Curated annotation (Swiss-Prot):
Keywords: Cell cycle, Cell division, Cytoplasm, Cytoskeleton, DNA-binding, Meiosis, Microtubule, Mitosis, Nucleus. Its main location: cytoplasm. GO terms for biological process: establishment of mitotic spindle localization; meiotic cell cycle; mitotic chromosome condensation; mitotic cytokinesis. The gene is nusap1-b. Belongs to the NUSAP family. Residues 44-206, 250-294, 338-496 are annotated as: Disordered. It comes from Xenopus laevis (African clawed frog). This is Nucleolar and spindle-associated protein 1-B. Residues 121-134, 467-485 have a biased composition (Basic and acidic residues).
Amino acid sequence: MDAPTLSELEGLRYSELQKLAKTAGLKANLKADKLLKALKVHFYPESKDESPDSDGCTSLTDTDELNSSQEKEEPVSVSFVTHRRGRGRKPLQNQAIPKDEFLSDSAGVGSESLASEIDNTQDKDCLESKKKEVSLPILDNKHKKRSRSQDTSKQNNSETTEKRQKKASNVSSIPSAGKIPRYVGRLSKPGSKPSTPNFKKLHEAHFKKMESIDKFMERKQKRLDAVSSSIQEVKMLTKKSNLLKLVEKTPVSDIKKPVKSRLSLLSPLPRTTGASPSRTPMSRRRSGRFSTANKSILVDRSGFKPSVLSSSKMNVRFSEATKDNEYKRSLIKTPARKSSSFLPITPKSEPRQTLSSIKKTDLLTSPEKAKKPDHNTTIQPSPAITESPCQQNKANTPFKFMAQNTETPNTNKKGSFDLQASLSRPLGYQPHRGKLKPWGESKENKSGSNSNVSVLKNNFKQPQLQTREERRKQHELDRKGKRDQALGTRRGVPVK
């Protein structure tokens, strides 16, 4: 059998290649590219001697590239060899760079990824050199096109080298990759590590910023002084304005008079026969000077005039006000005790007088007292006592109650007690009329209660149980009480 040429081998179909391999005694159950390579080695062993260190992938890539170039030249190719698409290696856009040039350009860049790229480019250079050796028996027009493609690839290589140099210069600024993982290196920096703050220092800094209590109190006092001073100034201005208004309204001689009247209100002066200084004109009292806002606190402002002038004559019976114990008529009024304030009165003399009437009689003169009618307790002033128009304008100062028994000249004298005179006077209470209750019933039966208590004291740990006899006695008593009540209701007698 004649050995086919290389071009004939490449133009055969896969089935024909298998038949050829079987006839040659080779393994036919292989892929197309490997089967073609095995046939070439079998029929042309010198091609193997020329490239002893060539890998199996070189011939495959050569055939792929040749077929691709033939397809570009002739859309309808003569070869009937079926090729597996997508399995072959695609040529890289950035072609190979010599290792020495790259190392010289990127000096100081010792990254593992760059070294692996250099190894890959070296392998590709080896493949290209082998492709050139294999493609010697191809036609001249193919060689021409190949040379053109190589020229374009060289231009591309020069461009890529420039780009790589630029990238290498940029990479040199980036630190070299070490064995530390990606994010662990950042944690080793002192600034980036989140550390717990020193709270003691923080608290001290805040405490220094704080204000001391003494300074705070000083500042508070200053603020209060400023506010109070402004208020005092306003008060002083209002007082001055009020004084100026009063000075404009009243003459200078009248301004000094109210001072005396104010003093007389506090402590009354002794009486004189002339115009008493304790009396002040009514018009003066009603002036703006004596308004409620300007009155002294010490003066009794209320118009209260005490009816009781002695503490011994105070009424302490509250049943009249509360209307309690109305059925006890005898207890509402009790005989008044004998007081030193009452005068001794004979049977033919006047009836009893109150303390107020006695006081008023003392104020009157002796000849006026003689002219008074006998049976009138109230005082009617005589024409000699009537006040003049100038005295009527003057008002009496209010009486100050000192809670002391007032002493008059007549009450100081102790008179002898007259029994007939006191009996002749009417009673000041309602006496009891009717039969009195027997004395024994009102008394409490203390003996029974005492005996009962003594029994309880003696037997406090053993309580007395009610026996059958005691219960029978109690039942008999209850029946007797019911019988008596029924009889009383039948006869119309109320039974308690």
